[in-house]
A protein has these predicted regions:
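A cross-kingdom marker of C-terminal helix-rich interaction/assembly modules
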Residues: 1-241
Length: 241
């Protein structure tokens, strides 16, 4: 029977032991462009984040792992939407620059932020908070999209079925669940769940990265993607039985 440990080994082997960072940086130089850099930057953060998740699971650092997985779901969703909707990339970059300037100057708004907000605010259902607009306003470039927030982002990335789990991970972000409070059964349960959610993100990462670069995830004569899909599918069947 395939185990969660085998699934985790494949993810760690791909991202940590074989330094996926070097591969992504090489492809970033090869496909360099004003807007593609944002996508490859996300790929880089996802790869590093999943590598940390693998190490964190081994260390039973559950609070850190839960926090990382919550962030990684948003990052992979963002990469998928930017990849599938090129019309969003300019606004995404514009908002990223504005956010960076606001953070570094410790301001809530500036001329650039107000101009962009006033241009787009009528497209949004309800009364949006400026913070949500600067985080997710680029989604408005998608035809028919009038909502902002992480749930809308996951929906646009076809990841809406895990929205409830993403919210659950907030419990770790806010230290509501600590490993020291868990029974052995609880630790086993969360370890398996963390591995499975890391696998979901890794699966989407491989698909998106292959779409962007044609990279086939063959490493040292091993078809990592083939091994992973077999293991992931078997674990998924076990979970449904």
């Amino acid at each position: 029977m395939v185990t969660y440990g085998e699934l985790l080994e494949i993810i760690g082997y791909t991202l940590v032991e074989n330094d996926m960072t070097e591969t992504i940086c090489r492809h970033m130089d090869e496909y360099r462009g004003e807007y593609t850099n944002s996508i490859f930057g996300l790929f880089l953060e996802i790869s590093k984040g999943l590598g940390l998740v693998c190490k964190g699971i081994e260390m039973q650092a559950f609070v850190q792992v839960g926090t990382l997985l919550r962030q990684l779901y948003e990052q992979i969703a963002t990469a998928i939407v930017l990849q599938n909707h090129p019309e969003t990339r300019k606004t995404f970059n514009d908002l990223s620059k504005i956010k960076t300037e606001l953070i570094t100057t410790n301001k809530d708004k500036n001329d650039a932020s107000e101009t962009l907000y006033n241009q787009k605010k009528d497209l949004i259902s309800g009364q949006p908070r400026r913070r949500d607009f600067f985080e997710y306003g680029w989604l408005l470039e998608i035809e028919g999209c009038h909502s902002l927030g992480s749930r809308e982002l996951l929906k646009q990335a076809n990841l809406f079925d895990i929205a409830a789990w993403k919210e659950f991970f907030n419990n770790f972000v806010h230290n509501k669940i600590l490993a020291i409070q868990m029974t052995d059964e609880g630790m086993s349960f969360y370890t398996n769940e963390f591995v499975y959610h890391a696998a979901i993100i890794f699966d989407r990462f491989m698909c998106a990265y292959h779409q962007a670069t044609d990279y086939n995830f063959h490493i040292a004569g091993r078809s990592v993607r083939f091994d992973f899909e077999n293991c992931f599918n078997e674990i998924t069947k076990q979970r449904k039985s």
